[in-house]
Amino acid sequence: LVVGAGPGGYVAGIRAAQLGLETIVIEGDKAGGTCLIRGCIPSKAIIHAAERFESLQQHASEGGHMGMSVSGEPEVDMGALVSWKDSIVKRLNKGVESLLKASGAELVKGWATFSGPKSCTVESSDGPINIESENVILATGSSHIDLPFMPCDEEFILSSTGALDLKKLPKRVAIVGGGYIGLELGCALAKLGTEVTVVEGLDSILAIMDKEIRRPLELWLKNHGVVVHTNALARSAQIK
């Protein structure tokens, strides 16, 4: 029994089934986990779209460079961009489900509650399913943590998950945290035309990384008008 169909869980489930074990993989959301559903894949899709938009803007400003012209100013339809991103995620999600099926592992969608070390009940759309297993792998992944003074409402105060599902492009955004997740989103939004401010509590962005890695990004942020405040702590947020 594998609880969680992320990159740890579904790979473990596939391998167990290939080795001849009767295998069930339980997933409460979608197969693929954080990286595929709400992390690396969707963020890279949005970054790719932002790069295309930035190139269009640059080409439009050059007025017909290389014999090619763009009529009017390029515009972003954020809802359409997110729908395109979702189509990529959906296709890859189906791919993971197909891999599980091909290996002989059974995917059960629902949330597992354990009543004992090797006994659980899954609340699925078809009703409760009781499962007894000889071995259990817990690969439940993680979720964002709300700041007590700045809880996410996913409308004005967004988690990284909510930021990947924007329906409208914000004029301005403040990103709390100068790690790679916040900066990925910040760079994409800056390319799309949003005014971005980054608030970082330590003395530099990407503080755990080498200076040789940080410096090119610091210059990029400066050149793209991204305001970075270091040694600064967010204390609250007000919606006006």
Give the residues covered by each predicted segment.
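N-terminal Rossmann-like FAD-binding beta1-loop-alpha1 element of flavoenzymes
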Residues: 1-25, 174-175, 181-191
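Short glycine/serine/threonine-biased micro-segments
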Residues: 2-7, 30-31, 37, 65, ...
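Residue-level marker of alpha-helix boundaries and capping positions
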Residues: 3, 86-87, 176, 208
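Glycine-rich flavin
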Residues: 14-21, 26-169, 202-206, 212-215, ...
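Glycine-centered short loops/turns at secondary-structure junctions
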Residues: 20, 193-195, 225
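Rossmann-like NAD(P)H-binding beta-loop-alpha module
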Residues: 167-209
